[in-house]
């Protein structure tokens, strides 16, 4: 991703604040991208209306869509100085509707807000979020309610020791995409690589096994591999973080 021309901003009709839309606007101002404010709608009572005629069922569906379209148009009205359009789709599986739209209309980026657990103060990924992570063919950016800080940090997670060609290619794509976002957000890029802890069962089953020595050897291998990967992208060792986990 070295350019962003089209952004799909996923709207959550159950929320008053649309953080995904706000971040989309920020990126659009910096990249010149167009935005589509996207929302799925489905009324499950529609499935209970088998006694109605086909025309009556269609009229009911159109009424629901029209109501949501008016609401969405009102939501984006403060941004009329940007190239922003709206799209409401009737679908009972939001992630499928999002992915189909991304494929059909060639979007470069999907931006969606996350949900925060009130008691735990932590981010919760919904089933829709997980489906998008696994299946969406274009990058997905999940955002929280806080604004992006100026001169902030972007952390790119890599698997620096992998010898799998797909993983190696993914590492490079992650770093390149992160570099592009750093340019837009005026941020600093850092890499993080995790290495596995020493298996406890080995230490128990093999008395002469030295877990500390093994752990240091694994850590050293990951440090060297991460630093080498960073060098390919003119990043310093100080921008690399290698942690057990």
Tell what function each PLM region has.
Residues 17, 65, 91-92, 122, ...:
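A conditional alpha-helix N-cap/helix-loop micro-motif detector
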Residues 3-5, 99-150:
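Gly/Ser-rich helix-loop-strand patches that form or flank binding pockets
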Residues 1-3, 23, 76-110, 117, ...:
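Structural beta-alpha unit
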Residues 38-40, 87-91, 143, 192-194, ...:
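Conserved beta-strand termini and adjacent loop/short-helix elements that scaffold enzyme active sites
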Residues 55-70, 210-221:
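A short acidic, glycine-rich active-site loop
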Residues 2-55, 153-208, 216, 231-232, ...:
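Small/aliphatic-rich secondary-structure junction motif
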């Amino acid at each position: 991703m070295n350019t962003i021309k089209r952004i799909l901003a996923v709207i959550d009709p159950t929320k008053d604040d649309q953080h995904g839309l706000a971040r989309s606007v920020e990126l659009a101002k910096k990249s010149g991208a167009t935005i589509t404010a996207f929302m799925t709608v489905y009324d499950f009572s529609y499935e209970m209306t088998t006694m109605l005629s086909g025309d009556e069922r269609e009229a009911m569906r159109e009424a629901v869509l029209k109501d949501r379209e008016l609401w969405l148009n009102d939501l984006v009205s403060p941004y009329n100085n940007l190239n922003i359009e709206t799209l409401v789709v009737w679908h009972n599986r939001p992630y499928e509707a999002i992915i189909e739209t991304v494929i059909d209309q060639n979007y470069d980026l999907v931006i969606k807000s996350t949900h925060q657990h009130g008691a735990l103060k932590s981010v919760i990924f919904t089933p829709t979020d997980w489906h998008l992570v696994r299946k969406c063919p274009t990058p997905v950016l999940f955002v929280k309610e806080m604004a992006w800080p100026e001169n902030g940090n972007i952390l790119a997670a890599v698997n620096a020791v992998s010898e799998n060609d797909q993983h190696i290619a993914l590492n490079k794509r992650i770093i390149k995409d992160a570099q592009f976002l750093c340019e837009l957000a005026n941020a600093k890029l850092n890499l993080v690589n995790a290495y596995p802890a020493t298996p406890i069962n080995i230490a128990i089953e093999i008395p002469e096994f030295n877990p500390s020595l093994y752990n240091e050897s694994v850590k050293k291998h990951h440090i060297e591999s991460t630093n080498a990967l960073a060098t390919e992208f003119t990043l310093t060792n100080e921008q690399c973080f290698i942690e057990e986990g």
